[in-house]
């Protein structure tokens, strides 16, 4: 579970 913006995309 990554809290990175790139992982979430939007």
From Swiss-Prot:
It comes from the Eukaryota. This is Unknown protein 23 from 2D-PAGE.
